[in-house]
Design a protein with these regions (language model features):
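A generic alpha-helix surface/boundary motif
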Residues: 51-55, 89-93, 125
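DNA major-groove recognition helix of helix-turn-helix/homeodomain DNA-binding modules
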Residues: 89-105
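Recognition helix of helix-turn-helix/homeodomain-like DNA-binding domains
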Residues: 62-91, 109-115
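The alpha-helix within a helix-turn-helix
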Residues: 57, 61, 66, 96
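Long, charge-rich C-terminal accessory regions
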Residues: 157-329, 334
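Short amphipathic recognition helices of helix-turn-helix/homeodomain-type DNA-binding modules
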Residues: 103-158, 304-356, 364, 368
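Amphipathic alpha-helical segments within well-ordered protein domains
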Residues: 77, 93-97, 128
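A short, Lys/Arg-rich alpha-helix, primarily the initiator
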Residues: 2-60, 147-148, 153-155
Length: 371
């Protein structure tokens, strides 16, 4: 296997890759035995000093003078007691600066609480990443941001479909900059290239969505010809993407795992908003599209079709390919100790007798038996 895993992650992997793990057993494992990776323990592995809480208290008190010390302390206690996690990206940057974390560590924490790591095409996050790199603190980073040239209204809609500058290009321009003068000049050069949405994820989304919306032609006996039918967004959702997941927002009676899996599950409205460039492509949707299409978007030769590959080799290759996609899109790689990722990996471990989407749907049916 090409993926390096910790002991706990490997235990989770062994369970999902075991041929004896049926869909029912998978649902039970998710509900009661999977050791979910948690925010605060992850943070303590990045910063092992004894003054972690003191640093965070000082940093948030400086960064948010309008909040009382009691309110800040309560938030920090909730994080350490695993009751909540930071809810906005700015808080993660404050943590990154307070603990002298690297860009990659801060980006990972952002991806931990949201769909994406540092968004290098978003000017504020780009400036934060530079300030992390050169060792500034949060307040110094804010001062630096205030010195930057005014930014035109950020674009939500890609120019000419797919011709906007991608995040990777921005990263390449800025990743090695170590001084303010060079950063500001490059910043000026890219003012029209900044944007809000993640375009690479949209690229992957639209390719997969088009495959589902325009399935292979079917033979029409009435006309003795092949007919191409374009599916509606609602039909794509119903036929391919629901997978027995309950609809609606009610979650009060759900377990933690049920809430994790149902959260941000796509629906026809969210698909429409993504297609209209009003909403970002979620990590959950991107992975779901891979499962439903099995990573196949055309008829080109693929080594995964070869019979000499073992199930273990196929799983390893799918895992590797998905991680490449996630990295390209600025998302965290698959984590066997993340509930949804575990389900994705379990679904990838399939053979000719059952499709990936069927395998995922069976587990969801056991997890939500009354729906």
């Amino acid at each position: 296997m090409r993926i390096d895993l910790t002991d706990l992650s490997y235990q989770a992997f062994e369970q999902l890759s075991n041929p004896a793990t049926t869909s029912f057993h998978a649902s039970e494992y998710l509900q009661s035995r999977l050791q979910i990776r948690e925010f605060y323990p992850t943070l303590t592995k990045m910063y092992s000093g004894n003054d972690l809480m003191e640093r965070l208290l000082h940093a948030f008190t400086e960064a948010k003078p309008a909040l009382s010390s009691a309110s800040i302390s309560r938030n920090l206690r909730n994080w350490t007691n695993k009751k909540t996690v930071p809810q906005n990206r700015e808080d993660i940057f404050i943590i990154g600066f307070a603990l002298n974390l690297s860009e990659s560590q801060t980006s990972y924490l952002l991806g931990f609480i949201s769909d994406y790591g540092i968004h290098y095409r978003e000017p504020r996050e780009l400036a934060f990443s530079y300030c992390l790199r050169i060792g500034r603190n949060y307040l110094e980073a804010l001062d630096f941001i205030n010195q930057l040239p005014p930014i035109p209204p950020l674009k939500k809609l890609p120019d000419a479909g797919f011709e906007s500058v991608r995040t990777q290009t921005i990263m390449d321009h800025f990743s090695n900059i170590q001084d303010d003068e060079t950063f500001i000049q490059e910043f000026k050069n890219n003012l029209t290239n900044f944007g809000v949405l993640h375009l690479r994820a949209y690229d992957y989304f639209i390719k997969s969505f088009e495959c589902l919306k325009n399935p292979y032609p079917s033979f029409d006996p009435a006309s003795s010809d092949f007919k191409v039918e374009e599916y509606s967004i609602e039909r794509v959702m119903d036929d391919y993407l629901t997978l027995h997941m309950p609809v609606g927002k009610k979650r009060s009676n759900y377990s933690l795992i049920q809430k994790m899996l149902k959260a941000d599950w796509p629906n026809a409205t969210s698909l429409t908003n993504i297609l209209n460039h009003k909403k970002d492509v979620s990590r959950k949707l991107l992975l779901l599209l891979y499962i439903v299409t099995e990573g196949v978007l055309n008829d080109d030769y693929d080594e995964l079709d070869e019979e000499y590959l073992t199930d273990e080799q196929r799983l390893d290759e799918h895992w590797w390919r998905i991680n490449l996609i996630l990295n390209e899109c600025g998302m965290n790689e698959l984590d066997p100790r993340n509930a949804y990722d575990w389900l994705v990996l379990y679904s990838l471990n399939t053979n000719d007798t059952i499709g990936m989407n069927e395998k995922m749907e069976q587990v969801i049916q056991f997890l939500f038996p009354s729906h």
